[in-house]
Amino acid sequence: MRTLAIFIFTAVAAHADPQLSSWVTEYSSKYARIHRTDAERVSNTTYTTWTNTRLTQALPAYAGIQSITYSDNWIYFNTTDLGPYTMGPWYDNAARTIEFVNLPVNQNINYRIPRTSTLATPPTTKSSMKGPEDAVGFFVDGVALYDPTDGFSYSGGTEASPGTGQWHREAYANEAITFDAGNTHQQNTGKYHNHANPIALRYLLGDHIDLNPTTNTYAESTSAVTKHSPILGWIRDGLPIYGPYGYSSPLDPNSGIRRMVGGFVKRNGATTGVDNITTTGRTALPAWATRNNGNIAASGPAVSTTYPIGRYCEDWAYLGDLIKSGSTKYQLGTDFDLNEYNVRYCVTPEFPNGTYAYFVNLTAAGVPQFPCNTNFYFFGNATGGTATASETVTDYFKGGANVQEIASPPVVDTATGNVTLTWSSIEGGTYQVEASTDLAVWSTLTTTKAAASNAIDTSLVEPGAQATYPKRFYRVKRTALASYDNGTTTTTPGGSEGISSISPASGNRGTTVTLTITLNNSYSMAPPPANVAPTSITLTKNGATTITSATYSRNSSTGVVTASFTLPAGATVGSYTVNASFGPNTWSLTNGFTVN
């Protein structure tokens, strides 16, 4: 139980360190919520628990950042990875008639970022974001930040996930139909994440975004830009990411505000100096890609309606590599603002002495453009990532069930004498409110005041108190808290899921097995029509290397998938999840196949 005195007003000063003060924490004691359909989005119908049999949020979970601690070298935080705004809905087709197969669930993530960012030595050596960590950083509302790819790449005539090719599918171009109004969606584990322009967060932070109250959708404001974008998140290399607006001159805060101009153009021949892969074919990677991938060369599919320009990240050329006129290349800082990593060196309101910083990349029309938030190579050394503090740390913030309620000064209505008491509250909490005239004897006004729903404050009115009591003190005590998800009660059902059966159910290392995979037609998200071929078939296991089928097909009459796997001699033994992917969606069977 917690007690607070209503007549005490506490003002919390902003911390001088933006790595601490930039996090959005005021909503952490409010339940995360979703819309399931467009109609519910318009009517503002929300849910605090949800299920589609594949992913279940069985109890309410608090939104976003739940704790922040720090040491000399690290910022540590815990997040549910659920947005503080209402998330959803998500669809799987442009007509928005088929619900997306995945729903977000509490991830209970512990993460850290370095307090000091360092650059690689030599500076041209950059590490890829395509590693074991899926999140390349986190937004300040606690939502995961992903690189611009969707996990698929082209190699050997097919697209696979996780792919090993050098032509990486661009997420915004291929998955945007599955994004919610905040430009965000979730993978098959329920991890809510953003690849491009976190517009709902930008609205919360006042970053030149308008909300349509009728449709509950967001759009870039049409008014003049008047202030620098805020910090939207932090990347694993310790650098901030800002919204799209910065100072016109990178080192002059008095130079005006404008949209940052990205450094990439499509390889369609429309810009002076750029090639046209429609006519030449995808015979070569752009210079920025080979410069960062270790000079690996690879060709891709011919441009077509199936593989249009923009489908792959490598369909974009970096202006700094192109000839603008004669022998002169386009110049960073003159022709464009952001380098090939989507980074600029500049002063910002939080860093008046200058910093390297990522920026959200938008077109003049406000549309995300590659590389959107970040490229898939880190600019700095990516020393941060998933971690729990194993050193002595200092608490900066505690949220959710551990938040300390704070009281506001009582408000007196002089016409009626009513006194309104307001305090920050925890959703799901029950409060006892007491009053006294002398701080010695207390009378109970209520023992059952429920915290306001979908709010961060709760109020109670004592009628006529001003006229009855010349002096009045109040105190509030939280006496109960409803059950909530602390990170251990969210479920991802196994057994019969998107796949109903696998045959055979096991195979030996060092051999080749052919699996017959029957999709579950009764699953909440029906499988694609039988004549639609899968894009990849994989076997996955935590801590083990993914095993990818090189040859697979689907019977166009029955819909049964056949996939051949070569089980490596050194493969990790044990149970694997079988995954059949069709574009951005995956149908799975947990523990469906055992490697002996």
Regions found by a protein language model. Name each.
Residues 190, 354, 429, 472, ...:
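A glycine-anchored, Pro-Gly-centered beta-turn/N-cap motif
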Residues 237-239, 244, 251-405:
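Extended, compositionally biased non-globular segments
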Residues 405-485:
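Short, composition-biased motifs enriched in small/polar/acidic residues
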Residues 7-16:
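Hydrophobic h-region of N-terminal signal peptides that target proteins for export
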